[in-house]
Amino acid sequence: MDLPGPIHDFLVVLLGSGLILGSMGVLLFNNSIYSAFSLGLVLVSISLFYILANAQFVAAAQLLIYVGAINVLIIFAVMFMKGSEYSKDFNLWTVGNGVTFLVCTSIFVSLMTTIVDTSWYGIIWTTRSNQILEQDLISNSQQIGIYLSTYFFLPFELISIILLAALIGAIAVARQ
């Protein structure tokens, strides 16, 4: 979106805070339904970030696929499960949680130091004239299709396998 600087910055901060609050809700809520709704907030915030970045097709795909299908599937799977058997013997902090926290913190710190230490001067930033020229030559959907079938073929196939495994797992849980 072509917004003035202060409005754009305000929206980025607002969406970022929604993203952080939603992800904290996913981690901290004891009720699985509330965690699933917080995940929906995170996915909607990511979709709105795509809209701010002028990627409306990716935003629509994010909303339809992740919020509309995957998150609803997670909510149905959580509703089919018995919640009482998972709330028994709930320890607030275990050794596995500590190890997971340390691993996630170290990955976060290494990513932040890598981002800060990387010189971003070699990256070519697109200008408005380049975007208009590219839109005249090829449509946005065709460009995404070309990238998915050439440069991002392996990650695209891996994501499809992961989604298939999640769907099979949800069906197996629902059958029990």
Curated annotation (Swiss-Prot):
This one is known as NAD(P)H-quinone oxidoreductase subunit 6, chloroplastic
Instruction: Spell out the reaction equation it catalyses.
Output: a plastoquinone + NADH + (n+1) H(+)(in) = a plastoquinol + NAD(+) + n H(+)(out); a plastoquinone + NADPH + (n+1) H(+)(in) = a plastoquinol + NADP(+) + n H(+)(out)
PANTHER family reported in the protein's UniProt record: NAD(P)H-QUINONE OXIDOREDUCTASE SUBUNIT 6, CHLOROPLASTIC
Q: What is its main location?
A: plastid
What's the name of its gene?
ndhG
Species the sequence originates in: Cucumis sativus
Q: Name one GO cellular component term.
A: chloroplast thylakoid membrane
Annotated EC: 7.1.1.-
> A single GO molecular function, which one?
quinone binding
Q: How does it assemble?
A: NDH is composed of at least 16 different subunits, 5 of which are encoded in the nucleus.
Q: Which residues cross the membrane?
A: 10-30, 33-53, 61-81, 92-112, 152-172
Q: What class of enzyme is it?
A: translocase
Q: What does this protein do?
A: NDH shuttles electrons from NAD(P)H:plastoquinone, via FMN and iron-sulfur (Fe-S) centers, to quinones in the photosynthetic chain and possibly in a chloroplast respiratory chain. The immediate electron acceptor for the enzyme in this species is believed to be plastoquinone. Couples the redox reaction to proton translocation, and thus conserves the redox energy in a proton gradient.
